[in-house]
C-alpha cells in the first residue's frame, strides 16, 4: 500500500520553509528546541478558541519574535490589549528573554488546512455526522477559491465497533508535484468512542519559481494585521451556504 508522506516536509526548501528560524551552537540547540516545543504547546492550548493556524518563532540576537496566524485575533489581543500583554510576559518567562509578539489575521479560514481540520474535529466532538462535516468544509473551501481539497477521517466513525477510514476529495490535489502549493493540517477529535484523526490537504495552485518563502508571501497578501475586533467566526459562511442549498432543493 502507498503511504502518504507529509507534504510540508516534502516541500521544505522548495516552496516552503521552516516555522522555527534560528541558528544555535551545539550546546544551546537542545535547550532552544525544547523551548520552541513548549511555547507552541502552550500557545495552542491557551489560544484554542482563537483558531491558531501557524506559529513562527525567530530568534534574532538573544531575542525571540513570535508570529501567530489566527482566525480570530481579537481573542488573543483582548480588551484594550490586556490579554496580549499578559501573554507576552508569560512567554518571556518561558524563553528567559525578551519576546516580541506579532498577530496576523487569517482572512479566509475556510481555505486554511489546519483550521479546516480543527473545525471538523470540533464538529465531531459535538456529535455532528462526519460526512456532513466533511462535505460542508469541502463546499466552503471550493467556493472561496481552493483549487482542490481532500479530507481524511479515521477511527471509530459513528461509534462503529471496527475503526475505518473515509475520505472525500474535490478538485485536484497533486501530492507528487513538488511545485504544487499544498497546505496540510491535522487535528484529533476526542469523542466518547475514542480519538478520531482528521487530515486535510488543500491545493492552492502552483509555485513555478524556486522560492522557499512562497507560502509566507502568499499569506502576506491574503492576510492583514490584526485589529481589536478579531476575525469572522468560523462556520458562519458554511451555514449560510447550507441554508441556500436547502432552499434550492425545496
From Swiss-Prot:
Any single biological process term in GO: translation
Function: Binds the lower part of the 30S subunit head. Binds mRNA in the 70S ribosome, positioning it for translation.
A matching Pfam family: Ribosomal_S3_C
SMART domains to which the protein is assigned, alphabetical: KH
Keyword ATP-binding found: no
GO molecular function: mRNA binding; rRNA binding; structural constituent of ribosome
Organism expressing this protein natively: Caulobacter vibrioides (strain NA1000 / CB15N) (Caulobacter crescentus)
Quaternary structure (record): Part of the 30S ribosomal subunit. Forms a tight complex with proteins S10 and S14.
Name of this protein: Small ribosomal subunit protein uS3
InterPro entries named in the record: KH_dom (IPR004087), KH_dom-like_a/b (IPR015946), KH_dom_type_2 (IPR004044), KH_sf_prok-type (IPR009019), Ribosomal_S3_C_sf (IPR036419), Ribosomal_uS3_bac-typ (IPR005704), Ribosomal_uS3_C (IPR001351), Ribosomal_uS3_CS (IPR018280)
